[in-house]
Amino acid sequence: MRLSEHIYRTISSIRGPLLFVERVFNARAGEIVRIVHPDGETVDGEVLKIEGETVLIQVFGETRGLGMDAPVAFTDGVKMAPLSPDMIGRVFDGSFHPIDGSPLFVPERWTPATGQPINPTARARPEEFIETGITAIDALNTLVKGQKLPVFSCAGLPSREVAAAVLQNARLAGGGEFVVVFVALGLTHHDYSFYMESLAEMKTGFVAFVNRADEPVVERLLAPRFGLAAAEFLAFNRGMDVLVLITDMTNYCDALREVSTAREELPGRRGYPGYMYSDLASLYERAGRIKGMAGSVTMLPVVTMPEDDITHPIPDLTGYITEGQIVLSRELHQKGVFPPVDVLPSLSRLMQRGIGAGHTRSDHRAIADRLYRHYAKGRDLRRLEAIVGREGMTAGDRVMLDFADAFERELIHQGSARRDINGSLDRGVELLKRFSLEAA
C-alpha cells in the first residue's frame, strides 16, 4: 500500500472514455485515479489494463478538454459505494451523486462497488412469494425471493410502463420490510421524466440510480454495480427484502461493447466482447439469499431483444444465467392487451418454491396448470381456424377459441389496475367456471 498519491502528467493518448498513461510504476488493476481538467474540475477513472509501464484508464466522466499534460493521480484505492439506510427515498446518477436536490447522506460504511460474491455453499434456497400486482407474473410465473427473473421485451413494446407498474406495485404478500432498488440506464429525456414521475408516486421505499443517454457511457457500467451494492447492504446488513429492477440491460451491454471497441479488444458475437457472459454473471449472480441471515436480493432485469431476436447474444446469455423469463408479446400489444405478457414462452423456474399453502394458496398450482393447458390448446386451434374457418370446427374447439380470447382480454389484460394474488386466482377460477373447464 502506498502512503501517498502518485501523480503523472504523461498521457499519451485519449480515445473516448479511455486514457493511455505512460511511464507509470506500481499501478494495479482496478485502482482508482483522479484526473484534473484545465478548469480545476476533477473526474475519477479506473485502471483497466497494465502493459509494462503503460496504463489504460477508463474515465468515469467527460474527457473532452483534457490535455496531454493533465495531472493523473493514482490513489491506491478502488471504486467505493457510500452506504446508509438514509439512501432510501433518494435518487442518484450513475456515479452515486445525488440528483434529487438534497446533499449526499453521511455514509455509515463504504464498500467496493463490485461487491462480494455469495459463497455457493452459504446460499439459501430462493423461496417465498413477491407480489408484483401483475396477474401474468403472480399467478402464472411467480417471482420468489432471491430469484433473478428477466423481462424480455422488443422495441416498441411498453416495457417502460411494465417496469413502472412493478416499481409502484411490488410488495411482500406477507408484509415485512421491503425496498425497491431501481436502476435505469441510457434514458432519453422523455423516459427520464416518465420514471421521475413514477418515483414521485412511490408508496414503498426505493433507492434509484438513473443514467441518461447523454451522460458518460461508463456510468452505464457503474450504475448497476452501485445499485447492487446498495441492495446487498439493505438486505444483508439491515435484513430487508430488496427487489432490484434494472432497465435496460441492452443499453448496458451496448456500453460494454463501446468501451471494448475503444480498448481495441477482439470482438465476439455481434461485436460484443467475449467476456460479456462473465460480466453479466457478475451482476446477476449477486441476487440471492444467505443461510442464517435475514433479507434477500431479488432481481428483475429488463432486456430489449434487438430485432425481436431471442437468440441475440444479450437475451441468450441472460437466459443461461437467470432462472426463467417473462416475455412481452408484440401480438398481444397490438390487441390492446396490457401488460402484453405471453405466458406460453414465459417461465419462472422457481415458481414451485413460492406458491401453495403457506405462501399463496393451496389451489394455486392446480389453477395455473388448468389455465395454461386450456389457453395453450386455444392458441393452437387458432392456426386450424385460419385454415378451415370457425364454421368448420367442432363445438368443443370453438369453446377453446373463445376461452383463449377471454383469457387474454380478461385475465392477462388489466390496464393500470393492481391485482393481489387472491384477486388474480379468483379471476382465473371464474374464467374456468364460465367455460365449464374448472374440472378439466
Curated annotation (Swiss-Prot):
The entry's keywords: ATP synthesis, Hydrogen ion transport, Ion transport, Transport
One GO term of the biological process aspect: proton motive force-driven plasma membrane ATP synthesis
Gene Ontology terms, MF aspect: ATP binding; proton-transporting ATP synthase activity, rotational mechanism
Any Pfam family hit: ATP-synt_ab_N
InterPro entries referenced in this protein's UniProt entry, alphabetically: ATP-synt_VA_C, ATPase_a/bsu_AS, ATPase_F1/V1/A1_a/bsu_N, ATPase_F1/V1/A1_a/bsu_N_sf, ATPase_F1/V1/A1_a/bsu_nucl-bd, P-loop_NTPase, V-ATPase_su_B/beta
Cross-referenced PROSITE patterns: ATPASE_ALPHA_BETA
Keyword Cell inner membrane: no
Taxonomic superkingdom: Bacteria
Described function: Produces ATP from ADP in the presence of a proton gradient across the membrane. The V-type beta chain is a regulatory subunit.
Family membership: Belongs to the ATPase alpha/beta chains family.
Protein name (database record): V-type ATP synthase beta chain
Native species: Geotalea uraniireducens (strain Rf4) (Geobacter uraniireducens)
